[in-house]
Design a protein with these regions (language model features):
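Short, acidic/small-residue loops that bind anionic groups at enzyme active sites
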Residues: 28-37, 57-65
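Structured adenosyl-cofactor binding patch, chiefly the S-adenosyl-L-methionine
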Residues: 46-90
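Rossmann-fold NAD(P)-binding glycine/threonine-rich loop
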Residues: 39, 45
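S-adenosyl-L-methionine/SAH cofactor-binding core of RNA-modifying enzymes
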Residues: 1-35
């Protein structure tokens, strides 16, 4: 069983929190592990994006590279807390 690979790219799909939660639940259900791939200052290669299972855009804004992992982790925790009926997401 392979990881479900989510590539982060500015051209990816924009998701609100509820849609991210629904996608997250599907990703977890479809695979043992979910991997998030974050590119460097020049982004990810087109080949890697094409081979990923999903391409997600955090925003059309430009963020410092070091901030993106923090944003991704916070959003993962937020949607996970929603799946557990935890009040963090409010």
């Amino acid at each position: 069983e392979h990881d479900f690979v989510v590539a982060l790219d500015k051209e990816g799909v924009n998701l609100d929190t509820e849609k991210l939660k629904l996608n997250f639940e599907n990703w977890i259900a479809s695979s043992k592990d979910v991997s998030f791939v974050i590119g460097g200052p020049d982004g990810l290669s087109k080949e890697l994006i094409k081979e990923s299972n999903f391409c997600w855009s955090l925003s059309q804004l430009t963020f410092p590279h070091a901030v993106v992992p923090i944003l991704v982790l916070e959003q993962i925790y937020r949607v996970w807390s929603m799946t557990q009926n935890h009040p963090y997401h409010r």
